[in-house]
Amino acid sequence: MSRTLCVMILALMLSSCGGGYKSPPHDLDNACSIAVQRPKYVRAFKATERRWGVPVAVQMATIYQESRFRGDARTPFRYALGIIPMGRQSSAFGYSQALDGTWDDYRRATGKRRAKRDNIRDASDFIGWYMTRSRDKNGIALNDARNQYLAYHEGHSGYARGSYNSKSWLLRVADEVEARAVLYNSQLARCG
């Protein structure tokens, strides 16, 4: 076989092996399954809960909604004339889908200059930091997944203005985040 063909076959075999922790776990509707597949995630969520007070289930429901537990998640491309790529819809990236500017604020505020959005520990810590600020600025309880998600999506000022009230789709999504947090919480109570 030619050297080029061997390299191509090897590359194909390696690419089919999977993507480690940046690929999502299987069965995202089962918190216990996620915990078994990704014990590193659970350690990160518990560390965030200890530091910031945000319940594990609220963090998990937020990450599910934002990235489906994909560490390399990005927003879709925008297209001109339906075919010419014009860049991404926003700078959101990683598990938490944090925007560049908000991520920079987090790194400055926490002193975590090397924090990365595709690292589950950093992403969950970011969520804890952001939701704690939502509690402080907007009076949202840390276990209120619905309103925490609305503030997470709209920003603290947007939440304070009630910008989400004119977005029926977002209100529906926030209800889904709340339902998923309740589901995850009940599952985690059974599996420890």
Residue ranges and their predicted role:
Residues 2-9:
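Sec-dependent signal peptide recognition
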Residues 10-11, 25:
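Residue-level signal for mature regions of secreted extracellular proteins and peptides
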Residues 13-16:
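C-terminal motif of bacterial Sec signal peptides marking the signal peptidase cleavage site
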Residues 20-192:
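Catalytic glycan-binding domains that act on GlcNAc-containing polysaccharides
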